[in-house]
Every structure is written in structure tokens, then in C-alpha cells.
Amino acid sequence: MTEHDVLDGRTARRDRNRLVVLDAVLQLFAEGDLSPTPETVARRSGLSLRSVYRYVSDRDDLVRSAIDRHLEMVGPMFVFEAIGEGTFDERVATFVAARLRLHKAIAPTARAAQARTRLRATPASEIIRESLHARRGMLRVQLARHFEAELTTFGTQADAILAAADGLTQIETIDWFLVDGGYTVEQTSEALVTGLHRLLGTVATRDQGK
């Protein structure tokens, strides 16, 4: 075995152990521990505390790195390829279904990110805040493009209607329905579908629902 092979083996082991650490953090997020300590992560990962600190510099870095890891894993779920396709009813249904799937995939990590930004400001928390802002902006753009035909009918009220629809369908709102509100997935889906119909439907469509 050459020196190069030895170095490659060490690098691969380090990369594997780093992922073990970050995946342990994600497991703790899912269990409700939104700000796990390095000691807790060490116990969960089966690695020593010293090993954990080889891969992250502090608690903030631990949480931020785990969030980044999760976003890499679920990145494709942020892509909504059916933008603008189908009738209004079909577009509402596909949009709500996509948002509920996205929530299911990212909810624990999103809660941890939210919790981290509410603590004292640190370089890591500011990075998380910027990432959240970018993700929310991307979801807002998807909404605007998907329902562009409807939004153009509202004239000067279009921005206000978009803001209301955006607030209704963001991940944090869905999380409120399912966690704090105690609604089922089916009830949440119905609420989002009804809300989007009321906000974005044509006058004729809204009148039919009265």
C-alpha cells in the first residue's frame, strides 16, 4: 500500500465520519432536539466528542452544517416542474400536493433553522437566516409563476394577493397547521386548496363557491 493509498483511506474515513455526525444531528432534529449539543451528537453517532470536534468548530457550526447536509439531500424536492400546467383546479391541486411533500421532507430541519435564527446573532445564524430567506423567495417565485394567469387579473392588488397566497403556503404555515393547529394532512390540504381558490380564483369561480 502506497502513502497515497493511506492518505486516500484516511480522507474517505474522515468524510464518512463527518456524515455520521451530521446524520446524527438530523435524527435529533426529527426527534425534536432542535439545538443538540456536541455531547449529545457524540452519543448518538457513536463517535467520541473529540471526533465530533474534528468535523465542526462549535455548536453553531454543527447545526449549520447539518442543515446544509439536509438541503443537499432534499434539494430536488424544491424543484417544481409542473409550473403553469393544467387548469386552475389542477394547478391548485398539484401545487398543494407538492408543498405538503416538501414539508414532510424538510419540516424538522426547517424548525431547527428557525429556532437557530431566533437565538443571539452569530455568523452561523446569519448564514442560516440568509439561506431561509433565499428558500422562501424561491418558493414565492414558484407560486407567482404557477398562478401568473390569475395574478395578472388583479391589477394593483396583485402583490397583496400574492403575499397572502405566499403566506398561506409557506413551509412554516403548513407546519403550524400540522403541529400547533393539530390538523390532519387531509384537513391541511383542504384548507390550502380552499384558500388558494378564494384568493386566486376568478370572480366567477369564487361566486360559485358561495
Map each language-model feature to its residues:
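Short, basic, alpha-helical segments at the C-terminal edge of helix-turn-helix-like DNA-binding modules
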Residues: 38, 67-75
